């Protein structure tokens, strides 16, 4: 029997071996092929010595899955999840188990990427289209987006849209009603300051007294009052004011729509449609506008088009509005949104249907009526005379009520002026109303819920004015009226899932996206009620588990990045960019350098960089790159000197977006610092740094970290994400604060960038588990394996395709770019043809035409085995052989497997297929690997131009179901 130590038998590194794709034998074979003796040798060949860390990270040793779960269970148990009546945009909800199990906890849904390849994403595109339909039906407006990050940032986007489209061009004031949620006002003020807008806050009726470009109202307001805005909106619109409304999605089931009152834009959180509170997120925001504003909408929009066979197909519409194309001229910097959560909300609406939603909303409203009736019967004064779910009370002994509430393990809303608020939700039971009477009135009140209910039924409810009761039908489309049994719902979800290619089927080698394993053990705690059901504004002494987890994660991220502090709040990478630039902006202002507003950005940068700079009120100056893809130092020196007096910062990605470690990175930092600027190092490629180097060690001042890339949070088909920022100590006082929750940091006074103080805190356990389980050595080995995999793929493919950029020793970093332009010239085969043909081989295409047009950028993460890498390489080699047949004339340019890709079942069943110059087998079974595990695209290549020219962003017409 083999002699093994107890340490070996304990297998503390088992998770590491399961996270990393290639086993030891595969790693050695790959090292032999690329010409390196070991991972350390390969690292030395690739990473410039001047930036290599001399010490290991201080994270600790790796641990086993059971040990990690036990530790985080201990953290979860420290959270005291009281019954929450705080409201303020966050509510208890019952996640249907059929959605929890089959969507939220299903890698077929949470590991997919944003649907840039729509032919292999028709399932989630349909679910998102359903979300848009729900949004349009409930708001009464024409066109909805595919989700934004949260309600508060959606408000900021609404303000920006209002300025873009308002005909009141000379106006610079945005009015905000004084009864909106405070976190919404906080985020709006932060954004307005960057844009140079003046924000005026006051009673809604006073909006008519100002020269405005836009105005924001809450429906229902933070105190629960329901207001008929019809006349006010008409008056404002007559003055060319763009009217925006923050609305409660559940209330809209019963209430007159804001669109019918005359609103231009309506937005809000979809959280209470079956998405847990999660201590603040992640949640999807809906955003809906009049059709005339469609070109100014922020974020992604799903539209209906047709495929090559003329069949209905879905795709992302009007992408020319977005940051990856328009850069600093984009409507928004939004990239990752909240697609997984939007899909959950849409499935919630599908599962309950219009009748089920009305029952839920009516039950919530009835409980509010009963609570109000009982309190008023005892002489309690209410602030609001109308309500849907929220009662605000004045004149109480606040200290006594709070003491009784805490004793009963419930949280109420306590305002600074002594008002006490109670917001009811889907989870409220009649026993909860009894308990609320006890807490608010004290014992011996004698109130009976059943008697109060009978009284309301007999007399009728007046809490929703008759003029504000919804009269029009909602969700009449068949999709929302046929899946109310769990069997049908389960099959509908599965049917959509089967149309999509996600990581549970094959490698997704998207460059700059880091589609690594999202291990099941990392995902488990997210569903635990101790993490899922915590309100973000709960007293912090009830959230000790969360606060300890956040502190530990922040400490680890500080160590990994080489910075001095971390701010967790930004809930996407793009928001992290914005937050980091704001910190730089405020730092300059604190030194009397408010004029420093120029941001240098290399021409190869990701589109979010210039879009975020514009969002932060900066002027973008583009610097050149040389033929090797590196920053042109001469041009940088010239530009930095020219703008030295106004230089704010540079935004640079490392390793570069060209997939190499630039040797001159420290010199770049020095040049910018010498001219008074700060260095923002984009963390998109952090997966090539962890344990080997760090932004702080390199010389940067601030970075965002994509937790949904480097630190294992799944992409969710387009979100959720997290973009915390790391900063040097001089920037720490200038990171985001929050108006509601103030944990006692020096940045507490700053404005917020997200609705919740800790952003999408509900998914932080994923990154915590990832780091905890891997430990210092595991994190480093993951990075080294990512380098190995990329260089293995690069060297294999270089025999068939030109590789565009390489670094020292002819190596790449964690990704490589193959140049398809020579092939296109010689054969007429485009990068699009190759991308779609990969679908036939069972692969999602690599990143297409970024950062260079006519290329594919490939990032095989550390989680992919040599077997999977070889399967991808074989597919690319086979495709090269197919291109050769087009080059030789054997196959026509306009009739070959690449031009006609992807192929569907309908194609091979078509008798006319025999007229093609290639066989059915070549079309759909181009390799032996495909025969054993075939992924079938459900539509042919989609016509993008038709979709934008014939814009339709709602569910299919009823005729499609006849």
Curated annotation (Swiss-Prot):
Residues where N6-(pyridoxal phosphate)lysine is found: 709
Enzyme class: oxidoreductase
Biological processes annotated in GO: glycine decarboxylation via glycine cleavage system
Catalysed reactions, as listed in the record: N(6)-[(R)-lipoyl]-L-lysyl-[glycine-cleavage complex H protein] + glycine + H(+) = N(6)-[(R)-S(8)-aminomethyldihydrolipoyl]-L-lysyl-[glycine-cleavage complex H protein] + CO2
Top-level taxon of the source organism: Bacteria
InterPro entries (alphabetical): GcvP, GDC-P_C, GDC-P_N, GDC_P, PyrdxlP-dep_Trfase, PyrdxlP-dep_Trfase_major, PyrdxlP-dep_Trfase_small
EC number: 1.4.4.2
Protein name: Glycine dehydrogenase (decarboxylating)
Organism: Shewanella baltica (strain OS223)
């Amino acid at each position: 029997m083999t002699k093994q130590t107890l340490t070996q038998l304990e297998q503390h590194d088992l998770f590491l071996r399961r996270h990393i794709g290639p086993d030891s034998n595969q790693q050695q074979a790959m090292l032999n092929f690329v010409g390196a003796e070991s991972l350390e040798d390969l690292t030395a060949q690739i990473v410039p010595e001047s930036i290599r860390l001399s010490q290991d990270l201080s994270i600790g040793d790796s641990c086993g899955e059971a040990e990690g779960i036990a530790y985080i269970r201990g953290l979860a148990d420290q959270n005291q999840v009281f019954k929450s009546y705080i409201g303020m945009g966050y509510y208890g909800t019952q996640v249907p188990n059929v959605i929890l199990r089959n969507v939220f906890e299903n890698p077929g849904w949470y590991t997919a990427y944003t649907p840039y390849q729509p032919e292999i994403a028709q399932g989630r595109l349909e679910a998102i289209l359903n979300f848009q339909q729900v949004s349009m039906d409930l708001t009464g407006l024409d066109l909805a987006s595919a989700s934004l990050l949260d309600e508060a940032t959606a408000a900021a986007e609404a303000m920006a849209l209002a300025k873009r489209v308002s005909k009141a061009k000379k106006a610079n004031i945005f009015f905000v009603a004084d009864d909106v949620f405070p976190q919404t006002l906080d985020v709006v003020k932060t954004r307005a300051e960057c844009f140079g807008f003046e924000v005026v806050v006051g009673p809604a009726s006073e909006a008519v007294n100002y020269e405005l470009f836009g105005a924001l109202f809450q429906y229902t307001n933070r105190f629960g009052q329901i207001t008929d805005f019809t006349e006010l909106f008409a008056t404002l619109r007559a003055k060319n004011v763009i009217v925006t409304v923050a609305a409660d999605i559940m209330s809209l089931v019963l209430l007159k729509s804001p669109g019918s009152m005359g609103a231009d834009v309506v937005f809000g959180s979809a959280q209470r449609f079956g998405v847990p509170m999660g201590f603040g997120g992640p949640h999807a925001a809906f955003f809906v506008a009049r059709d005339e504003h469609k070109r100014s909408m922020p974020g992604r929009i799903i539209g209906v088009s047709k495929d090559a066979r003329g069949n209905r197909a879905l795709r992302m519409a009007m992408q020319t509005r977005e940051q990856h194309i328009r850069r600093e001229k984009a409507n928004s910097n939004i990239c990752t949104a909240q697609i997984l959560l939007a899909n959950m909300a849409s499935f919630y609406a599908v599962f309950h249907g219009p009748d089920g939603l009305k029952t839920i909303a009516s039950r919530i409203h009835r409980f509010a009526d009963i609570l109000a009736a009982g309190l008023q019967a005892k002489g309690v004064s209410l602030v609001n005379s109308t309500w849907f779910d929220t009662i605000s009370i004045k004149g109480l002994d606040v200290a006594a009520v709070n003491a009784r509430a805490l004793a009963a393990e419930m949280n109420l809303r306590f305002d600074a002026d002594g008002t006490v608020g109670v917001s009811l939700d889907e989870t409220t039971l009649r026993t909860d109303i009894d308990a609320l009477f006890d807490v608010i009135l004290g014992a011996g009140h004698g109130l009976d819920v059943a008697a109060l209910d009978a009284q309301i039924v007999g007399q009728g409810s007046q809490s929703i004015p008759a003029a504000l009761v919804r009269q029009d039908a909602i969700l009449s489309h068949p999709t929302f009226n046929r899946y109310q049994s769990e069997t049908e719902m389960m099959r509908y979800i599965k049917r959509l899932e089967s149309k999509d290619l996600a990581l549970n089927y094959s490698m997704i080698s998207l460059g700059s996206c880091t589609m690594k394993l999202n291990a099941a053990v990392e995902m488990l705690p997210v569903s635990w009620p101790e993490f899922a059901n915590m309100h973000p504004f709960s007293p912090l002494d009830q959230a000790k588990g969360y606060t300890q987890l956040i502190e530990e994660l922040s400490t680890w991220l500080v160590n990994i990045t080489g910075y001095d502090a971390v701010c967790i709040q930004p809930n996407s990478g793009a928001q992290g960019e914005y937050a980091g630039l704001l910190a730089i902006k405020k730092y300059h202002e604190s030194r009397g350098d408010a004029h420093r507003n120029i941001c240098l950005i290399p021409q190869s940068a990701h589109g979010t960089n210039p879009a975020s700079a514009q969002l932060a009120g900066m002027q973008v100056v583009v610097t050149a790159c040389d033929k090797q893809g590196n920053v042109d130092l001469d041009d940088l020196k010239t530009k930095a000197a020219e703008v030295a007096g106004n230089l704010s910062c540079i935004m640079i990605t490392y390793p570069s977006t060209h997939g190499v470690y630039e040797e001159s990175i420290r010199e770049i930092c020095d040049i910018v610092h010498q001219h008074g600027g700060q260095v923002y190092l984009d963390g998109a490629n952090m997966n090539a740094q962890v344990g080997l180097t760090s932004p702080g060690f390199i010389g940067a001042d601030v970075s965002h970290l994509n937790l949904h890339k480097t630190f294992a949070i799944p992409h969710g088909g387009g979100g959720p994400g997290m973009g915390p920022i790391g900063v040097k100590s001089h920037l720490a006082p200038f990171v985001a604060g929050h108006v509601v929750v103030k944990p006692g940091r020096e940045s507490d006074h700053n404005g917020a960038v997200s609705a919740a103080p800790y952003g999408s805190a509900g998914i932080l356990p994923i990154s915590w588990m990832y780091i905890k389980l891997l430990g210092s050595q595991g994190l480093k080995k993951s990075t080294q394996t990512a380098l190995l995999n990329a260089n293995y793929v690069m060297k294999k493919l270089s025999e068939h395709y030109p590789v565009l950029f390489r670094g020292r020793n002819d190596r790449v970093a964690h990704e490589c770019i193959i140049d398809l332009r020579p092939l296109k010239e010689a054969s007429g085969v485009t990068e699009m043809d190759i991308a779609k043909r990969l679908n036939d081989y069972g692969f999602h295409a690599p990143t297409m035409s970024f950062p260079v047009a006519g290329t594919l950028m490939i990032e095989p993460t550390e989680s992919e085995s040599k077997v999977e890498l070889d399967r991808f390489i074989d597919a690319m080699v086979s495709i090269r052989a197919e291109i050769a047949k087009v080059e030789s004339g054997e196959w026509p340019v306009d009739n070959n497997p690449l031009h006609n890709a992807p192929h569907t079942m309908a194609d091979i069943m078509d008798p006319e297929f025999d007229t093609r110059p290639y066989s059915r087998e070549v079309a759909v079974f181009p390799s032996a690997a495909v025969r054993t595990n075939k992924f079938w695209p459900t539509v042919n290549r989609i016509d993008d131009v038709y979709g934008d020219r014939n814009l339709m962003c709602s569910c299919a017409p009823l005729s499609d179901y006849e």
